[in-house]
């Protein structure tokens, strides 16, 4: 399973204002095997072009929730015109999209009745996509424990800002370290994404710090196999 981070930023990154800024991050979005898109946010068409992806290759679109940085109707229409289909999910649902089995779990976010995290399997590898959201919910933890997850991607919006009000719907770095400690034996590899512009250091500093805790820090355009 190949994954490409089309965006790794939180909602406070705006292309018009910050696009030329060093370390610019688009709104968070992930592409699996160049065909399964998680979160059709406003920056996705630009990211697909910049990172050399075939827009006609995107076949499946799924969405964690409808906040503006994760869902954009124009992006969905843009990809539908190129052959993609949008598949809505509610928590507790499992759907088969081609070779992928996609299960949705309620997430701890401000729109929790609609906001979900995903576990995606291609029959060989298992990916947990856990943003947006704070502490993981019971059902998704049990699903992670049932069968080894090859890669877990966690929300790290709030940085090191201990006591930040966002921790009731987003993780800070202390929280992701604690989650990893509790699920270490169930997950082979850990990454963080969804970094807020105003709450994080430069990427290189963050990556060095989090490597000490066994985390990789995603950045726009980063591509890896799991």
Regions found by a protein language model. Give the residues of each.
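Cap/insert and terminal regions of metallo-dependent hydrolase folds
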Residues: 135-223
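Hydrophobic/aromatic beta-strand patches that form the interior of the parallel beta-sheet core
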Residues: 4, 60-62, 87, 103, ...
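Short acidic-hydrophobic surface loop/beta-edge motif
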Residues: 30-32, 92-99, 224-225
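Catalytic core of the metallo-beta-lactamase
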Residues: 93-148
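Active-site regions of enzymes building and remodeling cell-envelope glycoconjugates
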Residues: 80-92, 99-104, 212-216
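Conserved beta-strand hairpin/beta-sheet module of binuclear metal-dependent hydrolase folds
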Residues: 1-50, 114-131, 151
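Active-site metal-binding loops of divalent metal-dependent hydrolases
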Residues: 8-10, 35, 40-43, 66, ...
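Active-site metal-binding motif and surrounding structural segment of the metallo-beta-lactamase
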Residues: 35, 42-87, 148-152
């Amino acid at each position: 399973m190949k994954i490409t981070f089309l965006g790794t930023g939180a909602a406070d990154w705006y292309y018009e204002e910050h696009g030329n800024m060093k370390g610019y991050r688009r709104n968070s979005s992930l592409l699996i095997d160049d065909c399964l898109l998680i979160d059709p946010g406003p920056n996705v068409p630009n990211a697909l072009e910049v990172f050399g992806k075939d827009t006609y290759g995107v076949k499946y679109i799924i969405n964690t929730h409808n906040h503006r940085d994760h869902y954009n109707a124009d992006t969905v229409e843009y990809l539908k015109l190129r052959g993609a289909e949008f598949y809505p999910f509610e928590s507790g649902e499992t759907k088969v999209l081609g070779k992928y089995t996609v299960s949705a779990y309620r997430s701890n976010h401000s729109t929790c009745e609609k906001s979900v995290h995903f576990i995606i399997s291609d029959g060989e590898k298992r990916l947990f996509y856990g943003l947006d959201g704070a502490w993981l919910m019971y059902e998704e933890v049990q699903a992670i424990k049932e069968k080894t997850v090859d890669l877990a991607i966690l929300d790290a919006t709030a940085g090191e800002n201990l006591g930040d009000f966002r921790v009731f719907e987003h993780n800070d770095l202390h929280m992701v370290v604690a989650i990893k400690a509790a699920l270490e034996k169930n997950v082979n590899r850990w990454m963080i994404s969804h970094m807020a512009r105003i709450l994080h250091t430069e990427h290189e500093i963050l990556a060095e710090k989090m490597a000490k805790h066994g985390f990789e820090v995603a950045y726009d355009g980063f591509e890896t196999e799991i």
